[in-house]
């Protein structure tokens, strides 16, 4: 039996129009039990200022970003289901969905799936890793009823 514990923190000045806690729970449950039966994740929804600050502090990038992943690494002698934190910037997600002509809810789901895979150790630094990660993301997104997140809705079939 799998269990996913979500700690949802809303730090946006305006919380209108955000996905529901149930949406975030469903998206996590589509990913995490595939890799770990019991897991706990914090998702913090932030505005651009906080995203920019964290991105500059931890990645040296002087801009806000869609999702930041902070994996938790327990000492080897301690077993905890805590995977880590996802920081998702509302304005960047909304802007990207418009620019890429994607459904907003689908883009939110993709950010959660993508960030969760980072917490589980997946990365896209080299082409092989990127391809493996993208294939997993596409499969999970399809399972959730969403289209391939790497093909924008404006792209021809």
From Swiss-Prot:
UniProt keywords (A-Z) are:
Cytoplasm, Endonuclease, Hydrolase, Metal-binding, Nuclease, Ribosome biogenesis, rRNA processing, Zinc
Q: What is its main location?
A: cytoplasm
| Listed transmembrane segments | none
- The EC code for this enzyme is 3.1.-.-
Under Pfam families, the record lists: YbeY
Q: Which organism is it from?
A: Yersinia pseudotuberculosis serotype O:3 (strain YPIII)
Molecular functions per Gene Ontology: metalloendopeptidase activity; RNA endonuclease activity; zinc ion binding
Q: Where does Zn(2+) bind?
A: 114, 118, 124
**Family, per the entry?**
Belongs to the endoribonuclease YbeY family.
Which protein is depicted? Endoribonuclease YbeY
> Is the keyword Ion transport in the record?
no
Q: Where in the cell is it found?
A: Cytoplasm
The terms describing its cellular component in GO are: cytoplasm
PROSITE patterns per the UniProt record, alphabetical = UPF0054
